[in-house]
Amino acid sequence: MTPHINAKIGDFYPQCLLCGDPLRVSYIAKKFLQDAKEITNVRNMLGFSGKYKGRGISLMGHGMGIASCTIYVTELIKTYQVKELLRIGTCGAISPKVGLKDIIMATGASTDSKTNRVRFLNHDLSATPDFELSLRAYQTAKRLGIDLKVGNVFSSDFFYSFETHAFDLMAKYNHLAIEMEAAGLYATAMELNAKALCLCSVSDHLITKEALSPKERVESFDNMIILALEMMS
C-alpha cells in the first residue's frame, strides 16, 4: 500500500494500461476485460486487474499532468513491480500530418515542465519510450489495419493559456500533438528501469479547430484500447 494506491502487493499484473480519467479506466475494465476486479480507489483514482484473452493485465488512472502521473507511475513501479506501462489518452493535434481519430505513438516527448531538468541536473533529457514496446505497438497496428501515426508530442503543464504561436515551430520539429503526461512518464520509467509507451487518440485539432463529438470520442478511443490490449496480450 502507498499514500495514493490502496491495492495489496500482488494485485497489479506486470503490465498496466494508464489513463488520466479514472472513469475511463472503469469503462475499459467493464467493457473489455474478463474477471475485472477493482483493486484501488484512493481519491477515486480507480485501478482494476482482470484478463484479456486469458492474459492478466491491470488498469490505473493517473490524473492530469506530469506531477500527478509521475506519482502513480513511481508507486506502480517501485511498490507494485509493474514492468510495462502503456498510457492511452487523448491529445490535440498541431500538425497537418494527423487528423481527428488518428492514433499517435509518441516516439519522443518535449515539455515546458521543468521536472525532467530537475531530475537530470538541469540538462535536457531525451524523454523517449521503450523500443520493444514501440515495436510491438507498430506491428500490432499493422496487423489490425490501423494507420498508426509516429512522431513526437509536446507535454505541456498548461491546458489553458498555452502559447499557440509555438504550434508551427513544434510541427516543424515533427511534433504531432500536445498532451500533458508523456515526458514525465518516459523520464520516470527511464529512471526506474521500467518500460513505457504513450499512445494518444486525436480528439481535437488545434490548428483547424475541428473536434470530435462525444460519441466519436468514445468510438475512436475504443480503437486505441483494442490496439493497446492486443499489443500487451
From Swiss-Prot:
Function of the protein: Catalyzes the reversible phosphorolytic breakdown of the N-glycosidic bond in the beta-(deoxy)ribonucleoside molecules, with the formation of the corresponding free purine bases and pentose-1-phosphate.
Subunit structure as annotated in this protein's UniProt entry: Homohexamer; trimer of homodimers.
Reactions listed under catalytic activity: a purine D-ribonucleoside + phosphate = a purine nucleobase + alpha-D-ribose 1-phosphate; a purine 2'-deoxy-D-ribonucleoside + phosphate = a purine nucleobase + 2-deoxy-alpha-D-ribose 1-phosphate
EC top class, as a word: transferase
GO cellular component: cytosol
Binding positions for a purine D-ribonucleoside per the UniProt entry: H4, E179, M180, E181, S203, D204
Keywords recorded for this protein, A-Z: Glycosyltransferase, Transferase
Biological processes per GO annotation: purine nucleoside catabolic process
One Pfam family per UniProt: PNP_UDP_1
NCBIfam families: deoD, PRK05819.1
UniProt GO molecular function: purine-nucleoside phosphorylase activity
Positions marked as site (Important for catalytic activity): R217
E.C. code: 2.4.2.1
Name the record gives this protein: Purine nucleoside phosphorylase DeoD-type
Cited PROSITE patterns: PNP_UDP_1 (PS01232)
